[in-house]
Amino acid sequence: MGLPMLLATPVMAKEVVKIAFVGPLTGGVSNMGLGGRNSADLAVRLRNENPKSKYSYELVAQDDECKPNVGVQVATKVAADKSVVAGVTHYCSAVAMATGPVYNRFGMPAVVWGAVLPDVTYGNEFKEIHRVNGTMINQNDVAAKFMTGLGYKKWVIIHDTTDYGKGHNKYFSEFLQKSGGSILGTFGVTADQQDFTTELTKIRELKPDVIFFGGLTPLAVRIRTQMDKLGIKAQLEGTSGIKSDAYIQGAGKELAEGTLSFIEGAPWEKLPGGLFFTGKYSQQKYGESAEAYGPFAFAAANLIMDAVEKVGPDRKKVRDVLNKTKDVDTIIGKVTFDDHRQNIVPLITKYVVENGAWVVWEESSYGKGKRKLTGL
């Protein structure tokens, strides 16, 4: 009697779903874009390793160069591609502002992972635009109250003249005045400015306690190094836009020491999911750090994939699921979108550079009273 024939059951290949990542992969803030891309890539890799996943995911990365015109071009490219269901989009606020109408026109849901200008979500009624990170309003409220609470009284503000920089100037100035600080002068500089001798010479004469900088890492490095050359001893505090390894590398460990930055959300590296993220990120041996906003890109990609798993790769259905996001656990904490699809961020974390690394203020020697900031 012959053996019965065994028929192999074919394994059906999973449908491939494309997700776009858009950020600055080249240029002065490419470190942030590459960290964001790697983090979104990690989310996709981990999801594809999950046998319970209904779909196979592919990340389509595009470089917006942190330039609005380029951002519109690449946003149009991915949004016009119907095989791309949604996007993890933008670190630079000016780019996020320019591309919102594009995603709205094509009906492609986008989850912003780094841009902090409030109007990205609050300045429109685009149901396609969501944001997992907080806004500069939160940052500047804390930045002003914290520094006046330490005893500082006199400020000079330097900001870049993009929407990002002007927004930080607006909100920080308002909160500082409410907190009792005085502004001796405000200086707008271009985003690609190299020489700050004119501005810093005037600032040296004003003798501020603190220089507040509203801009991104490349300018912060130049300003900090040129402050030193001109003998300016003021304390430097900046926005989340300078919290990067590139700032410390560019300014050097000695000059970067004591610089302050404020970023929305709990310290992700202290959350259980953050430890998981750090371990998995290290295993992939990416050539770049995840940087401050990498975890937000990771969370954004996972929110999109969760929605696809629930309703399938349909843009409108995915958008509607994202719009109803409430108390979803992520590595950045619980995510809840308000009626403008803005994540409600409960707190701002204060960071200071100590011994060549960004350290949570409360855990630093400065926060513990063992070291003092400039002028205290």
At which residue positions do the language-model features occur?
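Extracytosolic ligand-binding ectodomains
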Residues: 13-376
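Sec/Tat signal peptide C-region and signal peptidase I cleavage site
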Residues: 7-13
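Bacterial N-terminal signal peptides
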Residues: 1-6
